[in-house]
């Protein structure tokens, strides 16, 4: 079995089209479900410009951050390319893995 590494991945959001991101979220979550169950997607969530000041306030989403367990950078990039957010143009693949 190949050696697996934990990759910290930051993906900036397309600030010009956050409505499409919100509408695509159900497909994004469904896509991630088997990755979570397999232990490939260790954790993830939105990154924010600021924390909400009050309950119910809209989140100022500027991207996502996640930990992906994989054997290579190319595997991580492929997982990101297959995500509905990436297919929508909501993330920058070139900037995704650091």
UniProtKB/Swiss-Prot annotation:
One Pfam short name: YCII
Top-level taxon in the UniProt lineage: Eukaryota
Transmembrane spans: none
Deleted gene: phenotype: Does not lead to any phenotypic changes.
Gene3D superfamilies: Dimeric alpha+beta barrel
Pathway per the UniProt entry: Secondary metabolite biosynthesis
Matches recorded under InterPro entries: Dimeric_a/b-barrel (IPR011008), Sec-metab_biosynth-assoc (IPR051807), YCII (IPR005545)
Similarity field: Belongs to the YciI family.
Function recorded in the entry: Part of the gene cluster that mediates the biosynthesis of the antibiotic 2,4-dihydroxy-3-methyl-6-(2-oxopropyl)benzaldehyde (DHMBA) and its derivatives. The direct non-reducing polyketide synthase dbaI product is 2,4-dihydroxy-3-methyl-6-(2-oxopropyl)benzaldehyde (DHMBA), produced by condensation of one acetyl-CoA starter unit with 4 malonyl-CoA units and one methylation step. The FAD-dependent monooxygenase dbaH is responsible for the synthesis of yellow pigments derived from the oxidation of DHMBA. The roles of dbaB, C, E and F have still to be determined.
Protein name: Derivative of benzaldehyde biosynthesis cluster protein C
Gene: dbaC
